[in-house]
Amino acid sequence: MAIVAVGTEIVQCARIAQMIQQHGEQFLERVFTAAEIDHCAQRPDATGHFSRRWAAKQAVFKALRCHRRGVSWTDIEIATHPSEGPTIELHGIAADLAEEAEIDAIHLSLGGCRTQAIAYVVLCD
């Protein structure tokens, strides 16, 4: 297994909080899947959870080099499995691009504090 690409993103949590406050459900439904919204909304620090997922999606966009290639935000889903922690599931065009690039594994690391969220993604063949 070799590293094909990496992507990283850092975001101010206040920026995501502002987007949620200004655009509400429209923003959430454009960027996050129903499962992601449900997961984050149930957490005491919902803004932090949404921010980390937003950062992860941006990191995937960078690693796949798929900006302006028709990939929607919801084509990249940050799923949470109790035994594994957060993982990336690709759908639609994002999944097609990963298959075309022969990506067999996607590794994700999320972090953050009260004010910032960060994600690091490694794509492997």
From Swiss-Prot:
Major subcellular site? cytoplasm
Entry keyword annotation includes Lipid biosynthesis: yes
Give the encoding gene's name. Answer: acpS
Query: What's this protein's family per the entry?
Result: Belongs to the P-Pant transferase superfamily. AcpS family.
Q: Name one GO biological process term.
A: fatty acid biosynthetic process
Q: Which residues form a coiled coil?
A: none
What does the record give as cofactor?
Mg(2+)
Q: GO molecular function terms here? A: holo-[acyl-carrier-protein] synthase activity; magnesium ion binding
Question: What's its catalytic activity?
Answer: apo-[ACP] + CoA = holo-[ACP] + adenosine 3',5'-bisphosphate + H(+)
**Binding annotation for Mg(2+):** 9, 58
User: What is the organism field in this record?
Assistant: Rhodopirellula baltica (strain DSM 10527 / NCIMB 13988 / SH1)
Q: What is this protein called?
A: Holo-[acyl-carrier-protein] synthase
Q: Which UniProt keywords apply?
A: Cytoplasm, Fatty acid biosynthesis, Fatty acid metabolism, Lipid biosynthesis, Lipid metabolism, Magnesium, Metal-binding, Transferase
Q: Which domain of life is it from?
A: Bacteria
